Amino acid sequence: IAEFFSHWPVIAICTLCVICGPLGHWRKDFVDELVGSVVMIVTQFSAGSWVGAGGHWQKWGWHAGGVVLADWIVGGPHVNPAVTLTNLALGKLRYAEFLCRVSAQFAGGILTFPICRWFAKMFKLPMFGGPTFDPAKVSFAAALWDEGVATFILCCAIFLLNWELPVRKNYLAKQSLTAVVIRFNLEMFSSSGCAMNPMLGTCWAIFLSSEAEGGRYAFPGDPSHYWCYWVAGFTGALLASLFYSLCSGTQFFG
């Protein structure tokens, strides 16, 4: 444990948490995002590896159940910097709350993958994979496009299912439909690994660095990582916010 907390990416994110975590009445949001990120990763990433390994449809079913369960357990946290950015753009939260939530999301991500590795080794389970792309197999342009479009579709679905459509009043129905949208994106826009979540892309990359020779946790050194998961992802989220703003009359960064 001491060695884990000696790596500078872990120190940086923990420092951000210390600064942003106690922000007044947003403490509950911080805890919800932290716990929600942990639950989301465990319940959704384990589908097809720890549970539902018997076939494609079983994997789909367990993943959908994980989407619903993760949201229900914690009470609907964002668990995604791109989604949190859309709420900032549409005036639903302030900059300080944005930082508070994102720091908690990162803390959850950077802690959960090593914990899952330890759990998998202890119970002799296969370690699940995460969102990544191989430049030798996938063009950079394709990865950018897929990540941006998938994030755009996810955010539009969240707006419609949670704020506009009648189904928003039925929790199980709207979360199940959200799971369908996520699975659709995973199948159709896979060039980037389809994170649809900058935190997942970067925390998984940090975790993979510890699996390499030397075992050091490090932020990705390739700029293409940040272009794909952050620039493309945030662009998709902001375009979805702008589109929703134009359709609903809501101010965009007003």
Locations of regions flagged by a protein language model:
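Membrane-interface helix-loop junctions and terminal tails of multi-pass membrane proteins
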Residues: 1-254
